Regions:
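Acidic, Ala/Val/Gly-enriched low-complexity intrinsically disordered segments
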Residues: 2-5, 10
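Phosphate/nucleotide-binding catalytic core
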Residues: 9-517
Length: 517
């Protein structure tokens, strides 16, 4: 882990932000674990602790005062490549050069993660976010170049090859990563089966969870009060489908063209603890969309404890402890929550002074550009605000299964997909976004106090991406086809595609403007 003084950033509006480790892996997964394997006694005691933590959480929710600043935050996972754009297994060296606590390891040695501090969305907040991200990434690029490494923002690196699975250096240093790999394989009892059927088909067995490291994302955070959490989560579940359709950027894995957002299905399979017999019995996967609308954040934590065995049963000495403000620490409950991979995850953070609840949106792939990332964030925050405050909630008119079906259809086919929408029926998702959702997102952003010129700046990007039906996935698929039509073999074409993608990414031109010639 990188240590050092927090990084400060002064925005174009003059606001000073300090980067600190609040929204990332340690907050959701707990502190560094102490073991790579666990005994039956540890697992038994951990289960007891989970139930105790859950009871404390239930009591605390009904009496506590939580932060209610409606702040937003962001995590961005990044790929590291060599100068030929093959994966570079040297995140430790890159992080040593960057020497900034805003940047941390991820499970794959060819990944790092950047954590952005919480900020207010109102006024110039979104532009401050854009400026800050660009500044931090430019700094990281400069430092990475010192060890001959490039940084790439995409959902799955197109140049990943099967040889990665046999490279013992793929896993980042740290007991928590080794423990997660061991626990998934032990729970499953056999090798990991990856079976993806899209434009092409890919099926193989992996001896570790290395395929999970291929999946890099943008994770958006929204701080909400206890009474607002359920409407916000339900709204986020509904818009998951148009979100993933708009942002799809992971069409290629292990030299195969698969789903537009292959990362969704790949992540599910890569850390699936269920052998086929358990899947056939209907046992829930750890990467989970959910199965019902909720009425409280407690519903989700209760499901976590009821349905999912512990992956990392790490017992904490602070289990019964509280902060100086009286917020229970609940370390086992929070660690367990970090090993249930919901696409919209609840976060309880006891904080240093005031506890807070957050919604962590995990649907978006990384990239393609900083402008696209902030436009995706604007769309998400605007839609959640609009839907959660509606007089007649949309989730009262949509079966949960329909929301889940929409999500999978959009992950598979991106902006080419069709969805079912209440009050409309079947509609192409691109048309839904342009005609209906962009105006609704604008209303939500207005309610949040976002400057009007910024609403237009970011939602124009969303509108044009949907209108042209060109996102990161469709551009990659089309550009690969063009290169192969010109005579390049698949491997050479993927290397050239990734070079051109990197060039476009650094231009910061939104992806709908990327050319195919």
């Amino acid at each position: 882990m990188v240590t050092g003084a927090p990084t400060q950033f002064v925005s174009s509006s003059g606001t000073r932000y300090t980067y600190f480790r609040t929204h990332g892996y340690l907050q959701t997964m707990g502190a560094e674990v102490n073991s790579k394997t666990y005994s039956r006694e540890q697992r038994t005691r951990y289960r007891q602790r989970l139930l105790e933590n859950l009871d404390r959480f239930a009591g605390y929710l009904s009496t506590a005062t939580f932060a209610d600043t409606a702040s937003i935050g962001l995590e961005l996972e990044l790929n590291l490549t060599n100068q030929d754009f093959s994966p570079a297994l040297r995140n430790a060296a890159v992080l040593e050069e960057i020497a900034d606590p805003a940047f941390q390891t991820e499970i794959g040695a060819f990944n790092i993660e950047m954590n952005h501090p919480a900020l207010a969305i109102g006024g110039s907040g979104l532009r401050d976010l854009e400026d800050s991200l660009r500044l931090q990434l430019n700094r990281a690029d400069t430092h990475a170049a010192e060890v001959k490494t490039e940084i790439l923002m995409t959902g799955i690196l197109p140049t990943l090859r099967p040889s990665l699975l046999d490279n013992k250096e793929w896993l980042s240093a740290g007991k928590r990563y080794a423990a997660l790999n061991t626990s998934v394989l032990q729970a499953r009892g056999e090798d990991v089966h990856i079976d993806l059927r899209g434009k092409e088909s890919l099926s193989f067995y992996a001896k570790n969870i290395a395929p999970e490291a291929a999946c890099t994302s943008v994770q958006l955070h929204l701080e909400v009060s206890p009474e607002d959490f359920a409407p916000a989560w339900n709204a986020a579940q509904i818009i998951a489908a148009p979100q993933v359709a708009l942002a799809a950027n992971s069409p290629i894995f292990m030299e195969h063209v698969l789903w537009h957002e292959t990362r969704i299905e790949l992540f599910k399979q890569a850390i699936d603890t269920r052998p086929p017999e358990m899947r056939n019995q209907g046992v829930r996967p750890r990467v989970w969309f959910g199965e019902r609308w909720i009425t409280s954040i407690f519903d989700l934590f209760e499901e976590n404890v009821r349905y999912f065995p512990a992956l990392l049963p790490e017992l904490s000495r602070s289990s019964g402890g509280s902060t100086s403000a009286g917020a229970p620490l609940l370390p086992e409950l929070r660690l367990h929550n970090g090993t249930v991979y919901r696409w919209n995850r609840p976060i309880y953070d006891p904080g240093e002074h005031t506890p807070n609840l957050r919604l962590e949106n995990r649907i978006l792939p990384a990239g393609p550009t900083v402008l696209d990332i902030v436009a995706n964030a604007a769309f998400f925050y605007g839609m959640v605000q609009h839907l959660r405050t509606a007089d007649r909630p949309l989730w009262t008119r949509l079966a949960f299964k329909s929301a889940a079906d929409n999500f999978l259809a959009c992950a598979r086919d991106g902006l080419e997909s069709t969805v079912y929408w209440p009050g409309i029926g079947e509609i192409p998702v691109a048309e839904l976004i342009v005609r209906h959702l962009v105006p609704q997102a604008a209303l939500g952003l207005q309610e949040l106090g976002v400057d009007q010129q910024l609403i237009e700046r970011y939602l124009d990007v969303i509108r044009e991406r949907a209108r042209t039906e060109q996102n990161g996935a469709s551009w990659q698929i089309s550009y690969l086809r063009r290169l192969e039509d010109e005579g390049l073999d698949r491997r050479a074409a993927l290397a050239e595609l990734t070079r051109k993608y990197w060039q476009n990414m650094n231009s910061n031109a939104p992806v709908h403007e990327w050319r195919l010639d």
